[in-house]
UniProtKB/Swiss-Prot annotation:
This is Heat-inducible transcription repressor HrcA. Gene3D superfamilies: 3.30.450.40, Heat-inducible transcription repressor hrca homolog, domain 3, Winged helix-like DNA-binding domain superfamily/Winged helix DNA-binding domain. GO terms for molecular function: DNA binding. Belongs to the HrcA family. GO terms for biological process: negative regulation of DNA-templated transcription. The gene is hrcA. Negative regulator of class I heat shock genes (grpE-dnaK-dnaJ and groELS operons). Prevents heat-shock induction of these operons. NCBIfam families: hrcA (TIGR00331).
Length: 341
């Protein structure tokens, strides 16, 4: 088979997939001749369609109907996308402005899925940060009374933990900054596991004679609370938007159930390891509940690491080029905001 024939058949396949995505109706040879500049007769296109069907790229639901893409056909279409639809400059500005108004990480992520759902008209999902990948950014100690302080632990993933701590004895205004400096020098810039190890070592110092006497008792209380806080691993959580968009398609009801249970989608997003977009189509999805859907996903993060995954879940006939563009743009701006914080 000549390269020209192969190129033409690829054009025919791309035309079938594009038309089916746009209309959700089977595509016939006459429709292709009328809509696309393929430069060949309807008979040649019919022959190409027969070959594509024999190779498993398209299928025919009824003898008298046109063709629709198979998962194999969608995969070849997606792999052949060289350029995704670019978002306009006003669209990009609007995305950044909307996300920058988020008051904290969770608000930024909620806004991101709202945007993705609106841009793609599908379900958008985002995974809250994997806390194991975070590093301690700062620990603040705020005096609430002679015996009580507010302990605030902040990580670069946006996690903020607050604890009211009863010290069991008074702490002076001079000793509080000294204690704050001790715990920050042990934790800042370190992973949660390393910070926990260092704080445990600091607790041992408080039990011995290597720490100033006036700080030992209060340091032991504070380090104990910090170790408990650092060891906590809240369950992964998904934020969703646009679930009603899937309700329009009855065959996607198992997907809706999977989204509600979260476990299946979390497993998929947990597999995201970088900021490259991944597309899994229909039967390519490992979990049965997602085999009627396509998932376009990517990672988001700061300058140090990927913190979690986000993406779009929709039918196999979703607009792949537009969806890839939207997911890429929103993840980019979320990552940019996190890196600036």
């Amino acid at each position: 088979m000549s390269s020209g024939t192969e190129h033409r058949r690829n054009q025919v396949l791309r035309a079938i997939v594009s038309d089916f995505i746009a209309s959700h109706e089977p595509v016939g040879s006459k429709m292709l001749v009328d809509r696309h500049q393929l430069g060949v007769s309807s008979a040649t296109i019919r022959n190409d369609m027969a070959v594509l069907e024999a190779e498993g790229y398209i299928t025919q639901q009824h003898a008298s109907s046109g063709r629709i893409p198979t998962v194999k056909g969608y995969r070849r279409f997606v792999d052949g996308i060289n350029e995704v639809k670019p978002l306009s400059t006003p669209e990009r500005r609007a995305i950044l402005d909307f996300l920058e108004h988020g008051v904290d990480l969770e608000d930024v992520l909620r806004r991101s899925v709202q945007l993705l759902s609106q841009l793609t008209r599908q379900v958008a999902v985002v995974q809250m940060p994997d806390l194991r990948r975070g590093r301690v950014k700062h620990c603040e100690l705020v005096k609430l009374g002679s015996h009580r302080i507010l302990l605030v632990l902040i990580t670069d993933t946006g996690r903020v933990d607050q604890r009211n701590v009863d010290l069991g004895q008074p702490i002076s205004d001079d000793d509080l900054p000294r204690l704050r400096d001790l715990v920050n020098s042990a934790m800042v810039g370190r992973t949660l596991d390393d910070a926990c190890t260092n704080i445990a070592a600091l607790a041992n110092e408080a039990k011995g004679n290597s720490m100033p006497e006036e700080l030992r008792d209060v340091a032991l209380v504070v380090t104990t609370v910090l170790v408990e806080t650092l060891l906590e691993r809240p369950n992964d959580r998904l934020i969703l938007a646009g679930t009603p968009n899937l309700m329009r398609t009855s065959e996607l009801s198992p997907v809706v159930e999977a989204l509600e249970e979260q476990v299946v989608v979390l497993k998929l997003l947990n597999s995201v390891r970088d900021l490259q977009v991944q597309v899994s189509i229909g039967e390519e999805n490992e979990d049965e509940e997602l085999r009627g859907a396509s998932v376009v996903s990517t990672g988001y993060g700061n300058a140090n690491a990927v913190l979690g995954g986000m993406g779009v879940v929709g039918p196999t006939h979703l607009d792949y080029s537009g969806t890839i563009s939207s997911v890429t743009a929103v993840a980019h701006y979320v990552s940019r905001i996190l890196s600036e914080e």
